């Protein structure tokens, strides 16, 4: 185990970690269900599902079987100009369980890249309509959307983790984050009015509104009132 840690220190740069002032690391032996088992024999509850990527738990027999079956055929092929049955079946299934207005599936490899692609879609749409000035984005403060350059530009500009890149990022439009559910029940006018004002004032420049679905995660697990999302959708239309 000590050799693993030593080699890790020598060759690996972990995400969200300093290359010089290094945080402790914990070698993992195996994982099952909601648990991570360390080389030391300790058992941990993975309460964040490995950054939300293992929502069905580790070592799920159905997923393991599907992975083993697929790897014996091919692990990966480029998706430009090619297709294959698993991708088509998954896209069809996603289409069946999402709103009718969402008709196509674009596969991506991370949350950051997914948001980045969505931003490009929005800009490209307005460009096709000859409205090339609509290339900026409106979002709420306290948000987190990813670690690529585009997604950093729409994450919280003051208290977020990307402050040091501020002068390198595109400048976007921000409004205050919405009230808590209880505060929204008492008075929903503030956040919606601010959003409406910004949309009216800057509509000629705004390509899209970007917002985390359901809640602001990294920003404090702040859950949106469902009506806020509904009213925001109406404002955008």
How does the language model describe each region?
Residues 180-181, 212-225:
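Conserved PLP phosphate-binding loop immediately N-terminal to the Schiff-base lysine helix
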Residues 92-208:
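PLP-dependent aspartate aminotransferase-fold enzymes
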Residues 222-237:
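Catalytic PLP-binding core of fold-type I/II PLP enzymes
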Residues 3-7, 71-106:
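Cysteine/selenocysteine-centered motifs that mediate thiol-based redox chemistry or coordinate metal-sulfur cofactors
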Residues 27-37, 52-69, 80-92:
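A structural motif shared across PLP-dependent enzymes of the aminotransferase-like
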Residues 45-48, 175-176, 210-215:
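Short beta-strands and strand-loop turn motifs
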Residues 1-32:
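Active-site-adjacent loop/helix segments that line or gate small-molecule/cofactor pockets in enzymes
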